[in-house]
Each structure stands twice: as C-alpha cells, then as structure tokens.
Amino acid sequence: MNTISSVFENLDKQCALIPFITAGDPDLVSTGKALQILDSYGADIIELGLPYSDPLADGPIIQEASNRALKQGINLNKILSMVKTVNMTIKAPIVLFTYYNPVLHLGINNFIYAISNAGIRGLLIPDLPIEESEYVISVCNLFNIELILLLAPTSSRERISKIIKRAPGCIYLVSTTGVTGQKSQLTSQLKELTETVKTMTNKSIILGFGISTTEQIKEIKGWNINGIVIGSAFVKRLSGNVPEAGLEQIQSFCQDAKNAIIS
C-alpha cells in the first residue's frame, strides 16, 4: 500500500481521485468489497468514515449511513479487523475520517496505534481544534500516520497561514460552509480561495464537501488542485441499493469520475 505523500508525488500534476464511503453501510462485508472496487477502478486515496452518533460536519446522506452502520453494531475494532485484511489486496492508502470524541474516548495514543496497526495511512478529524493538533500530529508521526488538517472557506489569512505551517502533509480545503453533501454549483469565491492557498504553500491541497458530479470534477481539476474528495455521491449509490447493485453503481461512478479527471 502506498503512503498518501507518495500518491501525490507519483501523480505529479494529475489530480488524485479520493472517494469517501461510510464503514459498515450497508454492511461491513460490502465495505470491504467497495474498498477493493474503488482501488481497482480509479481511486488514488480512499476516505473511510468511522460511524459516529453526532456527525456535525456530515450532511443527511452520510448521517443516515452512519446511523445504519451503528444500528448494526459496527465499531472501531470490527472496522480495523476488516481493513487489516483488505489492506493486503489494495494499493490506495486509506484515510480514516473520524470525529475527535472517539479518539479521546480510546485515548489518542491507543487510537492512533490501533489504526496504524491495521494499515490505515491517514487520519482526518474535522472537529480537531488547531490548538490541540500539535500533540496529535506528534503521535501520528510516531506511528507513520499522516494527519490531514482542514481549512474552512471562512478562515482569515492569519488562520490559513497558521494551519499551513502546522499541517504535516496535505491540507483539506473545505469547499463550502456547513455540512457535507451534494451541491449544485461551485463558487468563484472558492476558486479564489484555492488560488490564495496555493500561493502560500507548496503542500498538496485536496478539495471536498459538496462535490458530486463529473462536471464539477472537470471544473475543479483546472484549479491546480492535488486531490478531489467525493463523499455523498458514493455513499448514496452504495447505500440506496441492495449491496450487489450498490457495488456496481460505485464501480461505474468511480470510473466516470476518474475519466473526468484524466480527460
């Protein structure tokens, strides 16, 4: 399995495709199959969401997926056991998306050790205060986990600079205020923010929250972005069908998304 940094290095100027799916929805076996399908049909990095009872940054599609997974008794140990097995068959590094409370509940060191031992390569904590990130980064570095920091569109230039300096690797630029979900259009303000951030750092920039169509992908790839995260569009296809049909749909959409990037 590749590291996150090596993916961006190997892609050079090509944009990375980063699908997001919720672990355990519609079931954990399907999640494992979905990881393999995404890896085979164009994903460069894969975000895997840890189901959580109060997902403040997530839109309704991902919230519902998280609730369904929790009702099945899906937990971190079951997810990591599945990941450890699947990791042997895929190249795309997995980034675990989790809220801060589950990390604190288990203990920062214990949590990061556990995900590293399962083969997780990256960690994304949307509600991690930048003021508390230094220790988390130090533990992640110890266990070869790349912590990805988020940058909101409402951030001041001073805060942008602070996050850029603190970020150990790539930076996740949130495309909209509010929660994740499918948005009908992208704003010129977002493009300007992207250009501003790119002038302030050479670190890789990935863009997510609200990207759901191949038209949006084609538009964004021209912004000199290093990676595009697509979440709700994949989760909706996977969870809105019987498992076999959902897997077929994410395979097709993953191919379409990749073609939109490389075309």
From Swiss-Prot:
Coiled coil: none annotated. One of its GO terms (cellular component) is cytosol. Its EC number is 4.2.1.20. The active site is at residues 47, 58. GO terms for molecular function: tryptophan synthase activity. It is found in: Plastid, Chloroplast. It catalyses: (1S,2R)-1-C-(indol-3-yl)glycerol 3-phosphate + L-serine = D-glyceraldehyde 3-phosphate + L-tryptophan + H2O. Pathway: Amino-acid biosynthesis; L-tryptophan biosynthesis; L-tryptophan from chorismate: step 5/5. It is an enzyme of class 4 (lyase). Belongs to the TrpA family. HAMAP family: Trp_synth_alpha. Tetramer of two alpha and two beta chains. PANTHER family: TRYPTOPHAN SYNTHASE ALPHA CHAIN, CHLOROPLASTIC (PTHR43406:SF1), TRYPTOPHAN SYNTHASE, ALPHA CHAIN (PTHR43406). This is Tryptophan synthase alpha chain. It comes from Pyropia yezoensis (Susabi-nori). The gene is trpA.
